[in-house]
């Protein structure tokens, strides 16, 4: 045996094949046979009957649970990377990336911390891209080992419902599990609301007995998450929580708010705009406070936290108007960003937005309506169309929109049009992709970046 592969595409001669996808297609096993894998590891969820695969003449190793087996193999290979490294998981419909990065950046002031999620993997100045928000277990353990190699003591990671559904976290035990919020999204994957909710709750099943749950008390499903693991629960919200906040206001492109904990009040100066980011930051503060006893020290560190790429990110290229890049792609996130835009805009709001192909069809009408009603000019464009016809997506986005919509297929041209139309003190919002480095077109990932498109266009303002 040379290596273990979980994807038949990457199999080489004498590799051990351990398929991890929920549905094992016949082609995967044909690949294993064709590429002369040394063996296949399977459990009862894989049908390997001789009449189904008569030519499958390579050894089949039966195990009770292939996901746990994969964890055990890689955990041993990487020398138990989370043995002396805190594992912090963040789940929720919105806010996972921001909260996990806030934890990473805030905790990093006190103990070296890494991040893993939508924005890739990061520790010190090292950055790596990842395909999924929550990678496969072998990758998670590899990044855990890399964290330890760099003398890191904690890893803050995003835990998506899809990652939990596909058992990418099988075997892991979390020191801290954080719940941001839950909205009716991603039902194309989970089919029902109940399935989606139960998947999110799995993170708290994977929490250590002596670990902590940090829960958003203002979310209407708070009690559902509280039931999962009743010990060591920390809450945050506007009132009657372990950490409460009040008097939220925006001053000079910063958010100021009051934080109360155990009867004491603190003034927090945050670089992250909006109420939704107050929730995210308070969750991060509560997490860091588990490891750093001095709350005043933590709050002082908040003032100098870095910008989060692709999350309400203001771009300054000497242009006479404001440009904001944001990852908002759910109905709730789009609504929140548009509400905030109305509060900070001095003049016109111009928005570039699209909806992904092949998924979340039910939300297109809502996103199109929200953007067109809140913006002065809405430019609808592509966003990971995959195999779907763009005109079909546009039709759904515009069905309840106002007549202030411009349709431009090319995302690059759509952004150029928005920047060309912008005047002094206008606000240009580019939504949906954040700091993504690709466009999903058919079955290919084509290199693409909203940030690079904006930067290249804005070179003219420096002249």
Sequence positions of predicted segments:
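Structural beta-sheet core signal
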Residues: 115, 157, 177, 215, ...
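Acidic, Mg2+-coordinating active-site environments of NTP-dependent enzymes
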Residues: 14, 33, 46-49, 85, ...
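Short internal beta-strands
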Residues: 38-44, 213-217, 352-353, 377-384
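Short glycine-/acidic-enriched loop or helix-start segments at secondary-structure transitions
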Residues: 27-30, 49-52, 72, 99-100, ...
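Short secondary-structure boundary segments
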Residues: 43-45, 159, 181, 217, ...
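N-terminal leader/targeting and accessory segments in enzymes
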Residues: 1-72, 76, 220, 244-249, ...
